């Protein structure tokens, strides 16, 4: 029993003495996929926004500006109404009433 005890103790100490290592990454300094996608999305968004602002500044007319503001206010009011209806329907569906 003495040799088995020492053998078991040796194996336990050997296991505890070794570090548990995960898989090694090829390049730990490379950015994550989500960061890369987020950066590309933000670059596309900023370029599209800059193009839209440039087009707006180039073709600025007061009548068009008034129409755009009116259209925005009406569409945002409609979207808030439809969002409220959708939220109400979703809550009713989840409650089961």
UniProtKB/Swiss-Prot annotation:
Its main location: secreted. Residues 1-22 form the signal peptide. One of its GO terms (biological process) is positive regulation of phospholipid catabolic process. One of its GO terms (molecular function) is phospholipase binding. Keywords: Chylomicron, HDL, LDL, Lipid degradation, Lipid metabolism, Lipid transport, Secreted, Signal, Transport, VLDL. Proapolipoprotein C-II is synthesized as a sialic acid containing glycoprotein which is subsequently desialylated prior to its proteolytic processing. Residues 63-71 are annotated as: Lipid binding. One of its GO terms (cellular component) is high-density lipoprotein particle. Transmembrane segments: none annotated. Residues 75-97 are annotated as: Lipoprotein lipase cofactor. It is found in: Secreted. Belongs to the apolipoprotein C2 family. Component of chylomicrons, very low-density lipoproteins (VLDL), low-density lipoproteins (LDL), and high-density lipoproteins (HDL) in plasma. Plays an important role in lipoprotein metabolism as an activator of lipoprotein lipase. This is Apolipoprotein C-II. It comes from Grammomys surdaster. The lineage of its organism: Eukaryota, Metazoa, Chordata, Craniata, Vertebrata.
